[in-house]
Amino acid sequence: MTNMNQANHDRPEPEGNPLPWDDIDTAAMPADQVVSALEARLREDIENIGRDETEHDGVKPVEIYDRAYECKVLADSVSPEGARLTTMEVTFPRIILAEMNTHRVFSRNSASSRAIPIKKRIEMVKKHPYVPEYWGKLQKWMAADEQIDRELRQQAKETWLDARDHAVKYAEELAILGIHKQTVSRLLEPFLWQVAIISSTEWDNFFRLRTSPAAQPEMRAIAELMQEAHEISVPNEVKPGEWHLPLVKYEEKQEIPSEDQPWVSAGRCARVSYMKQEDERDWHKDRDLCQNIAKIGHRSPLEHVATPLEDASEWSGNFRGWKQLRKTMPEPSSQT
């Protein structure tokens, strides 16, 4: 990944902090070392860029960098029978969202091009665009195990950012015409970072497939961060009748009635579609939001919240050993 000013010295200096890998010469590295080198630099810079030290049920988030590859454990729980459920908030290039969505054992909600105002989307693309850090050479098969020549990589970066500039230009023109953001935002998606909340009891196959050298570099980068976060996180024991509650802080549990806590948690997971989780919020509004969207059939956020089953091998939806909040209410005829 590169800073916009690096890619073309005629471009204005973007606002915000320089990216942490600007001084790494990826051109001089073998292809199989590029992603590892970038991840190592990101981890080195954790203390310099700061972390959100807020604990959610005793779990401290793993936060790597703002608007770059990032993984944060929001909640990590284990049942008395040993079934583990983990919820993460991850940030990755939107270009791999389709691949991320192929994993059916994941429950997920993510930032929506239909929900986020086009002005904010354009600002994101201008200030912090996604730019590939690995430029694979055209060849047969799915994996590019060799980069293009060093002198061509800078041209590739400049061409990519030229495409970004054109996308912004035409998005702005469509917005002026009064076109809805659900259409205009599509022009910007190749250059966007995607934020998603993912919950699962089954991670091994994902880690095996997506951390492989054959995986697309962008997918491998975020998958390795997710695997590391999963390995170092220590789950809290949750008993039957209690709940796995992403985004509900320990101190909030003293204020929020126990019967409302699952709805508050699910409501906050739903809000990832259009707001940052660190934004100030009112738990009453989160509860009401969740209950309202559930009534009209938008129930995917209710999958992140779950309570242990007595049998750790029993399935509830796509979770094993945990019953999802979604499964506690009858499904409408039309569901999302």
Identify the meaning behind each predicted range:
Residues 2-336:
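A conserved ligand/cofactor-binding region detector
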